[in-house]
Each structure stands twice: as C-alpha cells, then as structure tokens.
C-alpha cells in the first residue's frame, strides 16, 4: 500500500503545483495583455492640440508698384512682427498679425517744365530714378487650412487681407539733367526725400500664401512663411511718370514676402 500512497501523494502534489503554475502563467499573460493594450491606447491618443499659438517672424520683401504706369521697377525691404494663431476646428485656424512692413517700388519720372514756357535748367528738365519705401504698420488677418500630411510636418495654405498705415515714406533718387543748358554738361545728383504727404496714409491689401511649421526643440516650432500681398487700394493717386497734370493714374504696391520665425503653443 505504501507505493500506492506515494503515487497518490505525488499525483496530488503535481496537481497542486500544476494548478499554481497554470494560475501564475494565466495571470502573467493577462497582465501582459493589459499592459500591451495600454501602450497601444497611449500611442493612439494624440496630445491635445493647443488652441492658441504665438510667434515672432521676420524676413525680406520684394516690392513693385502696379503696372498702371509703364515706368516702374522693384526694390527690397524688411518685414518683422508678431503673430497669434487660434485653432478653430480641426485643420482650420485664424491668424492675426502685427508687423512693421516695408513696401513700395521703383519709379522712373521724366520732368520737362519747358513745355510750360519755363527756361531749361537742371530743375525744370531732368530724369529721376526713385526707390520708394512705404514704411507701414501692417495688420494682416488670415484664414489658414493645415494640410494633414504628417504629425510633425504641418504645411498650411492661407488667404486674407491686411490694413496698412503708412507712417513714413522715403524716396531715394538719382536725378540726371543738363547742369548748364547749351554746354551739354550732364550731371547726376543722388539724394533722399521724405514724401509721406504725397502717398495715402491708409491702404488695404489682399494676401495669399503658404507656411510650414517644423519641430525645432521642446515645444518650439520653426516657421517658414511665403506670401504675396497685392494692393487693393492705391498707394499713390494721380501719379504721372511725365509729371503731366491730367494724365495720372492710381498705383498700388505689391509685395512678395519670405519670412522665418519661431512658434510657441499656449495652453
């Protein structure tokens, strides 16, 4: 009977340990499954998008007056300012900016007052090549659509408009004419002039553009911004490249602007 008792005892012990091992393995597998599911859920849950983003940006402007007058050309300027983006719904957002912006362009003017009976001189008959900078406070309001390509790679397209206040207009020019009529002594004078009173103080612009926001470090993003700003209202009224009364037209300032900036989310 002892061998039978030993066998039964061994079987009982084996069953006991088998049940314990099975229970342990089952518990381990269950906990491992729960842990893995938790990791998947965490990976699937994206960090909440900040409603507001603030930033600074600056860059260069390439400017040209509208072709209402044939004698126009381009010049360059600067743009620098602040921006605030409000994420409205999914990929849609509104952006408000305040910036110092240089617009303008080049103008070529032919002056000949001898047609009015004045004697010929350097003052009454000359050719002036001017580069005009409209130094303005610019307030753009933009509607943005972010293209959902990648989580950390966010290009966007936008349209909008801006109000610009010209607080200062500077004209730098080269004026060429006959210094001594009859002697053919041609000279060129270089100078600058404040011509704020000749230009409209208030202007409106239409804007279309695109930007790209890339992760830089921590929560800071790098901003690349490219836009075209077209004048909706004139910068100069009744401008004539011949300085002839009654033959003038309105000219507007159009600009291509490229900027770099930094964006920080605000919770």
PLM features: residue spans?
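Predominantly the C-terminal beta-signal and adjacent terminal strand-loop region
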Residues: 203, 211-267
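Cleavable N-terminal export/targeting peptides
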Residues: 1-48, 265-267
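Extracellular loop and loop/strand-boundary signature of outer-membrane beta-barrel proteins
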Residues: 66-70, 124-130, 193-198, 243-250
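Gram-negative (and chloroplast) outer-membrane scaffold detector with strong preference
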Residues: 42-52, 86-180, 216-218, 259-267
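Flexible, solvent-exposed coil segments and beta strand-coil junctions
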Residues: 59-65, 115-125, 182-193, 236-242
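Residues that define the transmembrane beta-barrel architecture of outer-membrane proteins
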Residues: 50-52, 74-78, 133-137, 153, ...
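Long, hydrophobic/aromatic N-terminal blocks
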Residues: 72-88, 92, 97, 187-190
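Short glycine/proline- and aromatic-enriched beta-strand/turn motifs that initiate or cap beta-hairpins
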Residues: 36-83, 263-267
């Amino acid at each position: 009977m002892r061998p039978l008792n030993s066998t039964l005892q061994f079987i009982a012990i084996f069953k006991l340990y088998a049940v314990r091992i099975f229970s342990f393995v089952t518990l381990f597998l269950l906990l491992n499954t729960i842990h893995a599911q938790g990791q998947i859920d965490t990976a699937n849950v994206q960090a909440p998008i900040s409603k507001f983003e603030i930033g600074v940006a600056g860059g260069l402007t390439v400017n040209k007056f509208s072709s209402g007058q044939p004698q126009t050309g381009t010049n360059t300027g600067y743009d620098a300012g602040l921006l605030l983006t409000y994420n409205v719904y999914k990929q849609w957002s509104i952006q408000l900016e305040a910036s110092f912006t240089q617009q303008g362009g080049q103008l070529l003017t032919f002056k000949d007052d001898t047609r009015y009976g004045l004697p010929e001189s350097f003052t009454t008959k000359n050719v002036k090549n001017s580069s005009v900078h409209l130094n303005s406070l610019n307030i753009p309001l933009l509607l943005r659509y972010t293209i959902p390509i990648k989580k950390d790679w966010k290009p966007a397209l936008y349209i909008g408009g801006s109000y610009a206040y010209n607080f200062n207009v500077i004209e730098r020019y080269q004026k060429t004419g006959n210094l001594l009529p009859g002697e053919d002594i041609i000279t060129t004078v270089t100078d600058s002039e404040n011509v704020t009173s000749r230009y409209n103080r208030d202007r409106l612009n239409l804007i279309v553009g695109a930007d790209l926001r890339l992760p830089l470090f921590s929560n800071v993003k790098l901003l690349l911004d490219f836009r075209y700003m077209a004048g909706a209202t004139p910068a100069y009224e009744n401008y004539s490249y011949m300085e002839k009364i009654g033959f003038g037209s309105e000219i507007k300032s159009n600009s291509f602007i490229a900027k770099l900036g930094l964006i920080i989310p605000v919770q």
